[in-house]
Amino acid sequence: KEENYFFKLSKYKDRIIEHIKKNPDFIQPEFRANEVLNQLEHIEDISVSRSKESVSWGIPVLGDDSQIIYVWIDALSNYITALGYDPETPSEMFKNYWPADVQVIGKDILKFHAIYWPAFLMALDIPLPKTILAHGWITIDQTKMSKSIGNVIAPKDVMETFELSHPDAFRYFMMVTAPTGRD
């Protein structure tokens, strides 16, 4: 156990549940929304920092050099900071592109994007993305593709084999052929 800063996630539980129920397209496919609703029933407040002793790198907590910002706070905030989010004077990019129409994510990080991220946005009074699309894993012989297992296919190799001139062609292929609801 260590001393950390916490975000009162429980304060936003009912609002997130209400948002999911009032916006049936918010989490797709629908069965993923049901998974999130089940997770919300048992949600607890979350630690948003880590001791500098346990994590040697990261963004320091302002005013407390003993703490580092939890990596998911940093990672999720990139969606809006990359667009120039500023509560005082939001950039034109932020005004034009937020809220996102669709955020495409893997099913293994659904909790972070469909529970934590909406709560953080609600706390800042920022609109939520319109849809979170959680895709399944890409598998080979019913096994998740994984660099650690060594069963991945490098996108660069696919592009060279099929003479694709731009990475967007490969991305498009994956979007239209990969199943969104299952592995």
Language model feature labels by segment:
Residues 1-183:
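Structured secondary-structure scaffolds
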